Amino acid sequence: MTKSAHTTPPPDAAARRSAPPVLTYSVEQLPPFDAGFYNRARAELSKVASLTVPARDARAFEVAAGHFFRIVSVEGPQVGDLNLWNSHDLAERFYSGKTRALHATHLSTGDRLWSSFPKLRPMATITHDTLDWYGWDEDGAGVHDVIGTRCDPYTRLLLKGMEYHHCCHSNLTRALAAERNLPLEEAEVHIHDVMNVFMCTGNTRDTHQYFMKASPVRPGDFIEFFAEIDLLVALSACPGGNCGASHSDDTAKCYPLKVEIHRPRESALSGWQSPAPNKYSRSHGTR
């Protein structure tokens, strides 16, 4: 979609456009990524659980604080849509927009997944990513984005005029409802903007529209997270498969995703504790 100018540029248009960019957040005060700690913790892991997320479906699972979980490509290139909640309080959930603002449009090793207001704290830290080599390609695309929201049946109906029930939004809704024994309508309000695991995306240079391209993920690739708090996690194996052509339909070749949960040696976590909730007073200028 091209933006057409309807007004005559002012005489100082070039000067206005030449203002230098400034990073929105100065993040030097964020706790640094302690690679040594996480590497020691992941050096000796015991697998305590695993599960398979079927193609075009989703599953929810618990991960205790101090454990690692991996999302693994097992049969073919497949994108996954990830939701996170505080296991004890579904109101605290992954905040993709703030994560994007604090880190970048695409995440990798050392980045954290931040929770919603008012807690605003790290929920999980990415500790290993076999696709970190990808970086930014010639189209400006990267992997593991926090730009896209998730494919959903409402937008599908709006744009295509047809219902489809295996979009990631619906998959995640069913998974949360089943895991927590909730009515679908109650579960749905907790589904939120995702981290698009393994998805390769960017914004077009001319119109700045969101685009996707075939994921570079291959069987054996994985992304690994450290649970900073007790987590409830839901993962959908996107109906778009590798998201190289379409989504929100049954045309793409899709594959399952594997999840592994690992426990480190207890001594490896010596001195570690879950991040405290944000300490803002919540007075909002009233006292």
Where are the model-predicted features located?
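Acidic, Ser/Thr/Pro
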Residues: T2-R287
